[in-house]
């Protein structure tokens, strides 16, 4: 009888131990991750690559960094080239890093470019989601407010941070993301990209005030400005971005401006046609009325073309 009681107690103790281990195994390590952006390097609009200087902090009451190395982390969308200023405490680990990262760019609004400068940190095997879970450490996350944190030609917006889960055939993992949105300067884009193009088109539009007797000179002006507009479009407006299979906003604006050249050329040809048909009846009054119509119709057609390309 005593032997049976001892066996029963031993079995119960084994079950208790197994349950304890099961509970311990089911309790993942909670680790707070913080990223503070110190500086932003070059942004390559063609490849979507960008260089970042930042601090990474790892905080966990469940992890002793003095007794074991920090969990291995993977920078999903780039690589770290240099790590310095490592600081280790019992439940705190921090280092400074410099790395190059990549993110997809949508060029549909070019040259009003927008890019999310993101850093994605993911745990790796054996630290699946049931072993390690990231949390956002707001205390050590952000971007320095000093004036040297800037990118020429870009405006830096407020960063944001979040944690998500990534599922793969080999397991589910925790991922921490830091995102710094940047946008092209609106004023700079208008002055550098669109004002020159509009000025070139204005030369073509000005031919409506040149008398029809100078039609050869008008054609020369139109030809020269059209070549200049095409050259500007291809070599400057489309510079710095890859060849894409859709129209950018710059392409749509240029298509509407090409309408001005087309209407101006049609105006010259109509004057030639009327001059040939009416001969002595082709008066200054007829010429002036035709020019007035084209001065009104040309901007209307240009706006219609722009709206069509934007909407469709």
Segment roles from a protein language model:
Residues 22-181:
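Soluble non-transmembrane domains of integral membrane proteins
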Residues 177-301:
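Channel- or pocket-lining gating/hinge segments that regulate access to a cavity or pore
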Residues 5-15:
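Bacterial N-terminal signal peptides
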Residues 16, 20-22:
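Boundary at the C-terminal end of the N-terminal hydrophobic targeting segment
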């Amino acid at each position: 009888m005593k032997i049976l009681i001892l066996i029963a107690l031993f079995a119960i103790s084994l079950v208790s131990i197994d349950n304890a281990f099961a509970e311990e195994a089911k309790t993942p390590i909670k680790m707070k991750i913080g990223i503070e952006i110190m500086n932003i390097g070059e942004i390559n609009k063609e490849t979507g690559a960008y260089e970042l200087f930042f601090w990474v902090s790892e905080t966990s009451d469940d992890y002793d960094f003095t007794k074991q190395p920090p969990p291995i982390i993977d920078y999903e969308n780039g690589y770290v080239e240099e790590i310095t200023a490592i600081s280790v405490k019992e439940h705190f680990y921090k280092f400074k890093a410099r790395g190059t990262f990549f993110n997809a760019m949508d060029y549909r609004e070019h040259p009003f470019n927008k890019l999310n400068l993101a850093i994605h940190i993911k745990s790796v095997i054996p630290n699946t989601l049931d072993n390690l879970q990231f949390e956002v450490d707001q205390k050590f996350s952000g971007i320095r407010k000093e004036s040297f944190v800037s990118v020429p030609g870009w405006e830096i917006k407020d960063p944001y941070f979040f944690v998500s889960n990534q599922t793969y055939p080999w397991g589910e993992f925790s991922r921490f993301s830091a995102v710094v949105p940047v946008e092209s300067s609106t004023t700079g884009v208008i002055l550098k990209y669109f004002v020159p193009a509009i000025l070139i088109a204005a030369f073509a539009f000005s031919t409506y005030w040149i008398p029809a007797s100078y039609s050869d000179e008008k054609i020369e002006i139109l030809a020269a400005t059209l070549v200049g507009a095409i050259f500007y479009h291809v070599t400057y407006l489309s510079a710095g971005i890859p060849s894409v299979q859709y129209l950018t906003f710059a392409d749509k604006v240029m298509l509407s401006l090409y309408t001005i050249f087309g209407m101006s050329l049609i105006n010259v040809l109509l004057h030639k046609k009327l001059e040939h048909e009416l001969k002595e009846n082709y008066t200054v009054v007829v010429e002036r009325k035709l020019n007035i119509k084209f001065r009104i119709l040309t901007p209307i057609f240009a706006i219609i073309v722009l709206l069509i390309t934007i909407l469709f």
